[in-house]
Amino acid sequence: MRVILGPMEGVLDHLMREMLTEINDYDFCVTEFVRVVSQPLPDHVFYRLCPELKQGSKTKNGVPVKVQLLGQDPHWMAENAIRAAQLGAHGIDLNFGCPAKMVNQSKGGAALLQHPELIYQVVKACRDAVPSHIPVSAKIRLGWENPEDCFEIVDAVEQGKADELTVHARTKAGGYKASEIKWDYIDQIRQRSTIPLIANGEIWNYADGQACIETTGIDSLMVCRGALNVPNLGNIVKHNHRAMPWHEVVDLLLKYTQYEVRGDKGKYYPNRIKQWFAYLRQAYPQAADLFRDIRTLTQVESIVEHLHHYREQLEVAQ
């Protein structure tokens, strides 16, 4: 089976990819989306969101990274796909699934689910423009409101000659509600089409992964939010490893501190780590207590000092 670390705008950046691919056996990663407008984007935009381009489009641990593009104009999507390929992208992924309101209002992401013909045009333009040895893939939801629309959408992607398709098994209207997951539609898609598929949505542990495989008939899975809830989720889903114990998560928080503070995003560190705690609290009750201690801290040094002190207390308690 394959397990892929999916994209999450504003969260799964290159620093998080580097850290999570060091402790998980991911087959590849997908970047946060590169927003395509009506012009060629400068190289620094691609390098900012995918600095791995400077090292063969791989993380430091050697995991391939695809560049994801989000936009609605076939010409400019293709032009920027060409540039990403020239910069060395391992693959080009096209975002037709982002449910964010601001993205949809500008006719990007999931908004295109209402226009399968435009999806076809974007996919075809990118596939025709990019050298054949570089895969062009897409990511969709089941539809805007009606999951039955997925078949026409998938047909558009397939007719555009995409090499692979990730299906998030909810509609845009379904948001991220667990009750809205519909893995059975991925099975129906598999039976009706020939395009290779990746299943995505509500995969939080090994049992979920196995249930998804059994329901969909697909053994390629993408994880996103869950990878932040439990940092070693990739290995849990792929190899049935135990969830990382809390003290190891704290060690990882300290490691993340080194990445963020020494990297190019140090000034954002307080917000970034607090954002991560919002996910960790879903799986680790201890995270809520630690978050209460640091949530009012605004200086990097104060947060780092508190984390070190907390880790020392854990060692004493053990």
Curated annotation (Swiss-Prot):
What are the residue positions of the site described as Interacts with tRNA? R35, N95, Y176, R272, K274, Y279, R295
EC category name: oxidoreductase
Cofactor(s) the protein needs: FMN
Cite the entry's keywords alphabetically: Flavoprotein, FMN, NADP, Oxidoreductase, RNA-binding, tRNA processing, tRNA-binding
Cell division listed as a keyword: no
**Keyword Zinc-finger on entry:** no
Which residues of this protein are catalytic?
C98 (proton donor)
Which residues are involved in binding FMN?
A: P7, M8, E9, Q68, K139, N200, G201, E202, C224, R225
Any idea which GO molecular function terms this record carries? flavin adenine dinucleotide binding; FMN binding; tRNA binding; tRNA-dihydrouridine16 synthase activity
Q: Which CDD domains match?
A: DUS_like_FMN (cd02801)
Which Gene3D superfamilies does this entry report, sorted A to Z? Aldolase class I, Dihydrouridine synthase, C-terminal recognition domain
The organism's place on the tree of life at top rank: Bacteria
Query: Could you tell me which InterPro entries the record lists for this protein?
Result: Aldolase_TIM, DUS-like_FMN-bd, DUS_fam, DusC, DusC_C, tRNA_hU_synthase_CS
Family to which this protein belongs: Belongs to the Dus family. DusC subfamily.
Question: What NCBIfam families does this protein map onto?
Answer: PRK10550.1 (NF007838)
Q: What does this protein do?
A: Catalyzes the synthesis of 5,6-dihydrouridine (D), a modified base found in the D-loop of most tRNAs, via the reduction of the C5-C6 double bond in target uridines. Specifically modifies U16 in tRNAs.
Q: What is this protein called?
A: tRNA-dihydrouridine(16) synthase
User: Which organism is this protein's natural source?
Assistant: Vibrio vulnificus (strain CMCP6)
Q: Which gene encodes it?
A: dusC
